[in-house]
């Protein structure tokens, strides 16, 4: 028994728990941080000359992309200087108009009349009669009455304001011609709604094609083209040849330029304002009956067209008279020279002495 006891190991060194000191010795030593490199005096001087800053730059956006450069802000002194320069020499803006009137070029660059925006103009008030028809037989009877009135006139030319209305949809585009309005006398306007009309009455076709009738309006040629597309019994070309576009006529008589709308032409010639409500202009012109706002809108369009025609006719007569008197007094050569200069005869003709 003792023999066996002496041979058995009392304590194994392998089973001994190592001391804490042994574990501490086996731990991986921490890596010491590198000391921040200090710039030498020469490097600091180079950075100062280069304008570098030691402040870390903040980047925005994705990593790897350079940060957007910040815009340089002007100092108050620089801003004041720029404002003063702009006030002294304002930037020239290119006009959106295609042409410039000869009147504006002749009068030291002053704006042409069609560009002048009046402060306040009185709105047009139409107090005449409005004759409104929707059925084919009624339209035919009314057109025949106007035709007989035209034939009784002693003048060789009878001006007639002409305009059209139709519905418009942004999905389907323009609809069929729905309304024709005419005016031969400022005291009465005729409105023909074509919704129930499959074919234009012969009396109405005869009226607009009558040799004594001079149809006029703004952008009137396109109206005739559309009318001919919607109603094959109408031929556009004869109507286009004899019609008068009030905008083009105004450019000839008043020596202006550019394209005109009825609203601007009314401001310039009649010195009136038009209530061009988008709600009425884009309304359902094909729906019977038309309401009071639609009837007044349609009547005013042709009424003011007749007023503008009469005024342009008067101005043209005055201009022709002044030009003839100038030719008799100064000769054709002086007249051509004045036309070349672009002077307006209505205001300059009596100031020229040769």
UniProtKB/Swiss-Prot annotation:
Residues 59-70 have a biased composition (Basic residues). Its EC number is 3.1.11.-. Its main location: nucleus. Residues 13-50, 71-91 have a biased composition (Basic and acidic residues). GO terms for molecular function: 3'-5' exonuclease activity; metal ion binding; nucleic acid binding. SUPFAM superfamilies: Ribonuclease H-like. Mg(2+) 1 binds at residues 163, 165, 301. Mg(2+) 2 binds at residue 163. Keywords: Exonuclease, Hydrolase, Magnesium, Metal-binding, Nuclease, Nucleus, Phosphoprotein. One of its GO terms (biological process) is negative regulation of mitotic recombination. Residues 1-120 are annotated as: Disordered. GO terms for cellular component: nucleus. Residues 149-314 form the 3'-5' exonuclease domain. It is an enzyme of class 3 (hydrolase). InterPro entries: 3'-5'_exonuclease_dom (IPR002562), 3-5_Exonuclease_domain (IPR051132), RNaseH-like_sf (IPR012337), RNaseH_sf (IPR036397). The modification Phosphoserine is found at residues 104, 110, 112. Pfam families: DNA_pol_A_exo1. It is found in: Nucleus. Belongs to the WRNexo family. Has exonuclease activity on both single-stranded and duplex templates bearing overhangs, but not blunt ended duplex DNA, and cleaves in a 3'-5' direction. Essential for the formation of DNA replication focal centers. Has an important role in maintaining genome stability. PANTHER family: 3'-5' EXONUCLEASE, 3-5 EXONUCLEASE. This is 3'-5' exonuclease.
